Amino acid sequence: MDSPLCFLPQMASDKAIKTRQSILDAAKAIIIEEGIGALTMERAATKAGISKGACMYHFKSKRALQAALVEEYAAHLSSELARHEALFDGPPEETLVPGFIEWFRSFDHDNHGWSTVGLAIHSNFVHDEELMRPVRLWY
C-alpha cells in the first residue's frame, strides 16, 4: 500500500529491503516487549543492529516508522484471513465467515506477537485517520 508517510524505493536493493525489514522487526519486538511508548528511532536502530542514521535513511521520522508498522499489520490481517479462508472450498462469499471463525479459534496461537502490536496500534492511533487508513481499509 502506498502511503505518503512510508517510502520504499522502486529499485531498492536486497540489502536495503532486508535492512528495512529488520528495522520493522525490531520496532515490533520493542512494542511486544516494552509497549509502544518505548518505541523510538534510536531504540529501533539499536535493536536492529544499525546506526540511527541508517534507520533514518529508511524511515525519515518516527511517524514514518509507525506508518510502515500499520501497513505491515494490515498486510498481516489480509494474509491471515486468506490463509484461513483457503482451508475451505467454495467461492469467497462462502469461505469468508468460516475463515474468520477458524482464524479466531487459532488467534492465540502462532501469531508472532501481532495481537499485541495490533492492540497497540488500535489503542494509540485510533483517532489518527491518516495513519490508520490501511487498517480501516482492511476492515
Regions found by a protein language model. Name each.
Residues 13, 63, 128-132:
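Active-site oxyanion-binding pockets that recognize sulfate/phosphate
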Residues 104, 123-124:
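Hydrophobic alpha-helical transmembrane segments
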Residues 68, 75, 81-115:
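Hydrophobic alpha-helical connector segments
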Residues 78, 98, 109-119, 125-139:
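Amphipathic alpha-helical packing segments from all-alpha helical-bundle domains
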Residues 1-18:
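N-terminal intrinsically disordered/low-complexity leader segments
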Residues 22, 30-64, 68:
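Helix-turn-helix
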